[in-house]
A protein has these predicted regions:
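Amphipathic, charge-rich alpha-helical segments that serve as recognition/docking helices
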Residues: 8-87, 92
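Amphipathic alpha-helical extensions and coiled-coil-like segments
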Residues: 49, 53-61, 79-179
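Short, conserved phosphate/pyrophosphate- and ester-handling motifs at nucleotide-, phospho-/glycolipid
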Residues: 3
């Protein structure tokens, strides 16, 4: 399962044999064991989503089984699967490059993608351009979700107007205007 770095190092040392330990595990169990034994940086939400999708598709694991094996909730599994199953590749790439936070993609873009891929792409571009934080992205998503088709279109065509209005509403009124 994991050993390509060790093999490359042994080749550089001129070794043509490798000592190995074979554990009697299924491929799925070996993949999960390999993940649990890693000491490197934690995987990104997308990488976890790809792994979950692989385990679901190739090995037939259901959401509950994946949640149990990862010691997480079904909702956690479902959100990460949504990243790779629902979001278009271009948006996954924006998440991969750090232009869009994975949490923003999971919480807001995945639900939009289920309703409209075009709106999802436009919203993703807005989030990427603004480097939107979760709170700001949530405000736009909530307005989009509550709006009619015409309101949704205006939100995505002129997001700056929406964000300007949000900033104005969040600022306290000047003291002289209070009664």
């Amino acid at each position: 399962i994991d050993g390509y770095k060790r093999i490359a190092a042994l080749e550089q040392l001129g070794r043509d044999t490798v000592d190995a330990v074979v554990w009697p595990l299924s491929e799925a169990a070996a993949i999960l064991l390999d993940r649990s034994l890693r000491f490197s940086e934690p995987e990104t939400a997308l990488e976890v989503g790809w792994l979950l999708a692989e385990l679901q598709q190739r090995f037939g694991y259901g959401l509950e089984e994946l949640a149990r094996r990862f010691d997480r909730s079904v909702s956690w599994v479902w959100r990460r699967l949504a990243l790779v199953e629902v979001l278009p590749e271009a948006i996954q790439e924006q998440v991969r490059q750090g232009q869009i936070a994975a949490q923003v993609a999971m919480k807001f873009l995945a639900p939009v993608a289920r309703q409209s891929l075009e709106d999802c792409r436009r919203m993703a571009d807005i989030f990427a351009q603004r480097r939107a934080e979760v709170r700001e992205a949530g405000q736009l998503y909530a307005a989009w979700r509550q709006g009619s088709r015409a309101v949704r279109k205006r939100l995505l065509e002129a997001p700056e107007l929406f964000f300007k209005t949000q900033r104005q509403q969040s600022q306290p009124a000047p003291a002289g205007l209070l009664r």
